[in-house]
Amino acid sequence: MSRDLTAVQAKAATLVEALPWLATFHGRTVVIKYGGHAMIDPGLAASFAADVVFLRYAGLRPVVVHGGGPQIDAMLRRLGIEPVFAAGLRVTTPETMDVVRMVLVGQVQREVVGLLNAHGPFAVGVSGEDGRLFTAVRRSAVVDGHDVDLGLVGEITEVNPTVIQSLLDDGHVPVVSSIAGGVDSDGRRCVYNVNADTAAAALAVALGAEKLVVLTDVEGLFADWPNTDEVISRLTADELEKLLPGLAAGMIPKMEACLRAVRGGVAAAHVLDGRVPHAILLEIFTDEGVGTMVVP
């Protein structure tokens, strides 16, 4: 009895297409910022975990940096605390910081580690405080010409990647929560809430990563925002810098992270639609790719 081999041959063609990329990226580090809809949709979360484990089996060294804004908001409201934002950043009182720390390290990180470890004993959770991975100083913001006190919101000033390097060398997949240690205005040690996009970019630079991948809830960087007909597939750091002032507010920190990464030595930064199943594999291992790639 004859068989229709079309579907099987298509799978083989996909594998062959991936071959040069597998050779190019074998042994290279890829930092992935995980957030958005891909984090809260069970099917997309499972797809994300499969992609990361595939990278590990394919010989790459993936690192996951996660946020958790929706989960933090939900917990704050359960505790009777209304989330407050200024200049696109969470105003973080000491009480809010306790919730941020609890949710990121105790809830979201555990969920991501569990998803990955369903495929094997790979993932290890790490807080930005561990091994002094991230050190930050208090960040300020200006709204309508006035300084705004953001509380315990930090800007990363130093990255010590030793603990991450050790985990990678041992074959693990680090899962990093975006908080940082530091000192307050009185010189006392404290913990800061840091933007996960910024944290991922800083870590990618410190690790000498080949790629930074940022998952979003849009298709990529649009050529003529707010028109969404055309996505820019590739642009240089200089081209991106010129576009930054006109971007949607939610895209600015993500594209700034890409800019910092490539100017810090990362070979390429990618903004992908996390709502697309297996977007990471499509971007890294196919000729067409998806999303937007930023190069130096």
Curated annotation (Swiss-Prot):
The keyword Lipid biosynthesis does not apply. Catalyzes the ATP-dependent phosphorylation of N-acetyl-L-glutamate. Pathway: Amino-acid biosynthesis; L-arginine biosynthesis; N(2)-acetyl-L-ornithine from L-glutamate: step 2/4. GO terms for molecular function: acetylglutamate kinase activity; ATP binding. The record marks 33, 254 as: Transition state stabilizer. Its EC number is 2.7.2.8. It is found in: Cytoplasm. The gene is argB. It comes from Acidothermus cellulolyticus (strain ATCC 43068 / DSM 8971 / 11B). It holds the Pfam family AA_kinase. GO terms for biological process: arginine biosynthetic process via ornithine; L-arginine biosynthetic process. Belongs to the acetylglutamate kinase family. ArgB subfamily. GO terms for cellular component: cytoplasm. This is Acetylglutamate kinase. It catalyses: N-acetyl-L-glutamate + ATP = N-acetyl-L-glutamyl 5-phosphate + ADP. It comes from the Bacteria. InterPro entries: AceGlu_kinase-like_sf (IPR036393), AcgluKinase_fam (IPR004662), ArgB (IPR037528), Asp/Glu/Uridylate_kinase (IPR001048), Glu/AcGlu_kinase (IPR001057), NAGK-C (IPR041727). Substrate binds at residues 68-69, 90, 193. Keywords: Amino-acid biosynthesis, Arginine biosynthesis, ATP-binding, Cytoplasm, Kinase, Nucleotide-binding, Transferase.
